[in-house]
Swiss-Prot record:
It is found in: Mitochondrion inner membrane. It comes from the Eukaryota. This is Putative cytochrome c oxidase subunit 5C-4. This protein is one of the nuclear-coded polypeptide chains of cytochrome c oxidase, the terminal oxidase in mitochondrial electron transport. The chain crosses the membrane at residues 20-37.
Amino acid sequence: MANVQKIGKAVYKGPSVVKEIIYGITLGFAVGGLWKMHHWNNQRRTKEFYDLLEKGEISVVVEDE
């Protein structure tokens, strides 16, 4: 039974600095990529809006009836 207790007991050695840095960098790249895709989407929508406005397909002026 003494061997079972030694195997089952987890020893906390403290935080791993290298592991924490790798986690931080990975999380930063993932969130940064999502943020960049969000901005690319906004840029595309703005460009499409101004292209349609220039072609005359849409208007920002309300038509009177």
